[in-house]
Amino acid sequence: MDKKYVYEFNEGDETMRELLGGKGANLAGMSKLGMPVPYGFTITTEACNQYYEDNETINDGIKAQIMEYLDLLEKKSGKKLGDEANPLLVSVRSGARASMPGMMDTILNLGMNKTVAETVATLTNNERFAYDSYRRFIQMYSDVVMGLSKKRFEEIIDEVKAERGITDDLDLNAEDMKKLVELFKAFYKNELKSEFPKEQLMGAIEAVFRSWNNPRAIYYRKMNDIPSSWGTAVNVQMMVFGNMGNDCGTGVAFTRNPSTGENKLYGEFLMNAQGEDVVAGIRTPQKIDQLKEVAPGAYDDFVAITKKLETHYRNMQDMEFTIEKGKLFMLQTRNGKRTAQAALKIACDMVDEGMITTDEALMMVEPKQLDSLLHPMFDADELKKAEPIASALPASPGAACGQIVFSAEEAIQEASRNHKVILVRLETSPEDIEGMHVSQGILTVRGGMTSHAAVVARGMGTCCVSGCGDINMHDDEGYFEINGVKYHRGDWISLDGSTGNIYGSAIKTVPASISGDFERFMNWADERRTLKVRTNADTPHDAKQAHEFGAQGIGLVRTEHMFFEGDRIKAVREMIVSKTAAQRRVALEKILPMQRSDFEGIYEAMQGLPVTIRYLDPPLHEFLPTNSYDITQLAKDMHIGLDELKSVISSLHEFNPMMGHRGCRLAISYPEIAEMQTTAVIQAALAVNERHPDWKIEPEIMIPLVGDVAELRYVKKVVCDVADKLIQESELDMKYHVGTMIEIPRAALLADEIAKEAEFFSFGTNDLTQMTFGFSRDDAGGFLQDYYDKKIFEQDPFAHLDQRGVGKLVKMATELGRSTRPNIKLGICGEHGGDPASIEFCHRVGLNYVSCSPYRVPIARLAAAQAAIKFDK
């Protein structure tokens, strides 16, 4: 038997989402429940994929099945497509398995032509309705199927209204509608040099398949991790009309409030209108509860159906309906999109109502949604009035409003005067850390979602919009330009880190409101998950923040970030330009108390929870100045000649610093650095243990960039010699642990050997991804877009762990490590530690913990619980 590509609504059910798409599956489900659903059929997602395999054509076999089901639809409805006596009109709508509202295309009133319009006018005794439906169809078909500009059709409508001296579409009469039909057809003919077609169904179905790959659908898929291989289904359904007269209408409603979660029907409707009128906002709709005055019978039926649907689907529903001559028809139901606050309230309320279990509640909330709860938000009313000047990548969520500055120094200076600033840069570097920290938000011209700016901003919970190519930078002259408009230093701008929108004025922000539902919901997540969640934190402030968000320790303290602050950088630079180990030790002695104080602060903030401290990782040249003024100043401070300093800087230059003199290689060349860091770690832990004996802190020392067990053995000896001596002298009983990062593929391949020396592994997936792919994270943004456009990659491997390649190394290292040290502790501390899909992978391969930015801790806690629910059955 030939493969089945088409299903009548009553042949399927809601479990068939993968094949019928969300809309088709739910239409089938509603039909099975005996609800008033207009007759129709669904063309499957497999037909969409076949369409692309057949070079964007619908093959004869699929066409034959479509015509067979059209014949069935005509028999059931008693109407025929294109028939003069009793014409059938249909809608052709998309329906992917994941909800993608507004991303793909819809065509209504298909089957309309001049003769059909005349018949409909006679049958309904409503000429205006017939020609209104006809002109809408020409407009939609021309736009969706033939690619003509929507805007020109709107202009033609405005011209006709102006001629008549009217402003409202409702005041257009039957003659006006006839005139619009002729004007629309003339525009169509003029643009496409052909008459408006009589055969329309296959063209419309092809257009919906094509819309799966329109730019906005591709962008939405990328944003929501929806694979392009899923395809969209197409639903062909008999039209019911909300625009036939005053006893007709159309509306959209939610079973609960999608903004607040309140258990009250929420929605809008319009009488004498078609579906898109409600969404388009041309006319102001009425609130749903007013429907009981206008159409009481339809309202009562609708309320009963909403209750039945929510109980059946065990989730808040978003529904579309039409009333034709007083009779209610259901056109769609789906799980409704909702704010994070609403999601938590609905989940908790439904558990209290006995409708769902706590496991179902946990699966109901999208982990990434929790992000928006933790950052300041724009005032919703103010945001509605604002118009974006540009849009770029939403790299770190939140709402930021401040005055433009162009350098980290300016940011620090202005912030010290209590001025709110937005740091605008071509790109950021580690030296900008302090300026970034004091800024309300960060806007970069270059860089992607995992650029330096994005990673650091997320870690700090600072709003960041990156990669805005529309900006022409003239920072030397104190301004940047977008679309010919100049924005000067000191001007107010606002950034929306959730959408990537940039606004040219100040928009009021309000603090994020975390409700009691949040704590209750997260407790359910913590009870369910087996994977521990730690944080990446470099300061006591970050550590405290993460602890409040529920972190169970720190998986990564990047000690180099501490070196960039204030006076410390001078001592670090002094150490770098020293010629002998003795000179280096003098400089390191200055850094020691600062590092020790930082570590004490972090231990205090974490109150006895485990803390993993990574030793110095970046190449030394990153700590040296790059502009001539700073170089001259450093030479003076160091009492050395300018040429001599330039020679040192030049000698540290590397062609490929990512794979150069960094990580454990620095500790091997300069063991005194590891000695100083060990002294700081152990002394800090001993001091805090003395103050809080019940905390029993056991420092975890992590050696970065190990590729061979001999490297680890050498550095470990340096660490243990210092640590053992200090502990012995203190006369306190304190354990410590030495482990390594697995971030070089060779280390993953030799993990069994390395585990003999390492008490724990932490997978540094940022570098492991770079080294496995051979991509530089800082440069990949320049060509990865081509990979996405050409469907070579669907996802950014720096944002979502590459499970097939990098993941295979992680799995291998996990198994090899445990083969020689069964109790080895395993975690992940790259950016992937906060990505739900990557967390699911970590759960599956049996890691002990994930570590992520403080503001991603709640996301990771929920994602870990969802992984346990999915895979521990």
Map each language-model feature to its residues.
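Conserved alpha/beta-domain cores
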Residues: 93, 514, 524-873
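Flexible inter-domain linker/hinge segments
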Residues: 212, 374-406, 520-526, 530-537, ...
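Glycine-rich phosphate/ribose-binding loops and adjacent secondary-structure elements
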Residues: 327-329, 426-437, 441-443, 449-455, ...
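Extended, non-globular alpha-helical segments
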Residues: 392-431, 482-520
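Nucleotide/phosphate-binding sheet-loop regions of phosphoryl- and nucleotidyl-transfer enzymes
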Residues: 1-386, 413, 419-422, 429-434, ...
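Short beta->alpha connector loops at strand-helix junctions that form conserved
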Residues: 41, 445-447, 466-469, 557, ...
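Structural motif
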Residues: 235, 405, 422-424, 443, ...
